[in-house]
Amino acid sequence: MGFLSLFTKEIAIDLGTANTVILHNDKVVVDEPSIIAVERNTRRVMAVGKKALMMHGRTHENILTIRPLKDGVIADFQSTEMMLREFIKMTGTRGILFPPALKMVICIPSGITEVEERAVRDSAEQSGAKEVRLIHEPMAAAVGIGIDVLDANGNMIVDIGGGTSEIAV
C-alpha cells in the first residue's frame, strides 16, 4: 500500500436491479439487495440492503421501501444516490482524519441511453465519487473471469441479471 492510497480509494460497483455488489482491493465488501427503506415524510434513510428487504411489505405506513433500479437502469435518482451512499459507508473505505477521494468503476447495461448513463454517473458523483468510469456489464464480466479482452480470440459472455440479460461476443 503506497502513500497515495491513504488519500484515494478505488471501488468497483455492480449496481443491479436485484442486488448491488461492491469490490475493494479485489474483495467483495458489499453484496446486498438493491432496496432502501425511508421515512415517507422526511425521506430519511431507515435501512438499506438486507435490512430494508426484511422490512419490505411489513412496514408501518410511514416507512416506504423502494427498489430504485428498474430493468437495469435508475428509476429513482434520489433513492439510488442515498442507497449508494449507505453501501459505500459499508465498504470500510473511510479515512482516519478525512474521507478519501473515491474512484469508482460502475457496470452499466450495454443498451442504455445517454440520459440513463448520465444518471448513473451523477448518482455516483453525488454519492461521493471524485472520478467515475463506466464499463458495460459483459465487458466487466469478461475481465472478472480473467478473459484477455484484447486477445484476437472470440469469447461469448452471457450475463444474466435481475433486470437485464445480455449476450456479448
What spans do the regions from the language model cover?
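Nucleotide/phosphate-binding catalytic cleft detector across ATP-hydrolyzing
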Residues: M1-G162, A168-V169
